[in-house]
Amino acid sequence: MANDDVTRQIEAFKRHLEDMKLRADSAQYEFVTTVCNEVERTAKTLMRDTETNPDVTYGTKGHHPSMPGSAPAVDTGALRQSITHSVEVDSSGNVTGYVGSIIRNPPYGAYLEFGTSKMKPRPWLSTAVIKCRSFMQQVSDRIYKRIAK
């Protein structure tokens, strides 16, 4: 009789662990997806709301660039429109999120993010990630509370 009770308890505990793993896997995907969405949105907003230098103009449209150290000001909108994210799950169940520009040739987003020999950096992605830190913690706390039940 005692062995049957122990066996039932062990089986119940195994089911509980399997359920926790499923909830944790789902929570990991939810966290990465939610954070990537927010970083993408924040990067685009930074470009829209950045301070420009009224004393400098470029091009035929009279584009005013952003101040060095600020997110890049929108000129054509190509970079802003190219910012996207993706979330991948590998064969082991690990979830990885990517946020960035899909423009690769030339790597315009990287030139602005890190600067060039002739232009100081206009960080947009790293600034977006930094601005999202408290959001990331809030999402993590919310998900943890839900799955820890």
Role assignments for model-derived ranges:
Residues 1-149:
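Short, Lys/Arg-rich flexible segments
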